Amino acid sequence: MSSHADSNPWTVPALAQAKRAGRKLVMLTAYDASFARTFDVNGVDLILVGDSLGMVMQGHDSTLAVTTADMVYHTAAVARALDRALLVADLSFQADATPERALDAATQLLQAGAEMVKIEGAGHKLEVIRYLVEREIPVCSHLGLTPQSVLRFGGYKVQGRGEAGEQLRRDAQAVVDAGASLVVLECVPTPIATQISAELSVPTIGIGAGPGCDGQVLVMHDMLGLDSGHRRPKFVKDFLAEGGSVAGAVRAYAQAVRDGSFPDAEHAYAA
């Protein structure tokens, strides 16, 4: 099977090439230079500076308190450590409320070292995605359980069951048509995530979306079995227990994603 040479930095076009080659993508969150460097040299393909930092770094109950300034600070720290992995950064809550606001926030993140920005949802966000892509800013879409919508969802719940699965399929195609180069699917039943992954021309990255996605992402604290003070999701696996060290855990996670052993049924959601 074709693989991306370890010495070659990942680029946006290389993501689509990996999908065509059947090469699973390995993604982790990071928020500082030390962890980012460890992830970069131990087989992680994409680093996400997620607004999850509000929960695991700042101690909030949700991601809603995170600001663009927070995202820029952590993105810059992570960017200084990377030689190989592609750096994706979240647009924080309401930073993408309008195309103009999104452009301002995305510009700051790219200037800090991000190579792609992540936007939650579809609907009116399609206009935002098109606006950014037309201005040469690569976009990753985030569908399914979108944490910035936690108040509307009434908590962190599986999305895309029943008729909602068909809407999720439509949304996934719509964000790709709008220009997204990558799609994160969170807390989505395995069958619908697998179907979406087969239908899209761009890679999907699953988190609680089963093994049929084109890659996987976990919050680093979850992958390392750290207690962040929040309920442990079903899809989380502690790789530090088998890896023996942070670097060993990262290598074990990366290998499990690439060989398809993670996630298994225990760490996914049925239809």
From Swiss-Prot:
Positions annotated to bind Mg(2+): 51, 90, 120
Catalytic residues as annotated in Swiss-Prot or TrEMBL: 186 (proton acceptor)
EC id: 2.1.2.11
Biological process, per Gene Ontology: pantothenate biosynthetic process
Short name of one Pfam family: Pantoate_transf
Catalytic activity: 3-methyl-2-oxobutanoate + (6R)-5,10-methylene-5,6,7,8-tetrahydrofolate + H2O = 2-dehydropantoate + (6S)-5,6,7,8-tetrahydrofolate
Gene3D superfamilies recorded: Phosphoenolpyruvate-binding domains (3.20.20.60)
UniProt-annotated binding residues for 3-methyl-2-oxobutanoate: 51-52, 90, 118
Cofactor(s) the protein requires to work: Mg(2+)
Keywords, in A-Z order: Cytoplasm, Magnesium, Metal-binding, Pantothenate biosynthesis, Transferase
A cellular component term, taken from the record's GO annotations: cytoplasm
GO MF, any single term: magnesium ion binding
Leading EC class: transferase
Pathway: Cofactor biosynthesis; (R)-pantothenate biosynthesis; (R)-pantoate from 3-methyl-2-oxobutanoate: step 1/2
Main location: cytoplasm
Record function comment: Catalyzes the reversible reaction in which hydroxymethyl group from 5,10-methylenetetrahydrofolate is transferred onto alpha-ketoisovalerate to form ketopantoate.
Oligomeric and partner information: Homodecamer; pentamer of dimers.
Similarity annotation: Belongs to the PanB family.
UniProt-recorded name of the protein: 3-methyl-2-oxobutanoate hydroxymethyltransferase
Gene name for this UniProt entry: panB
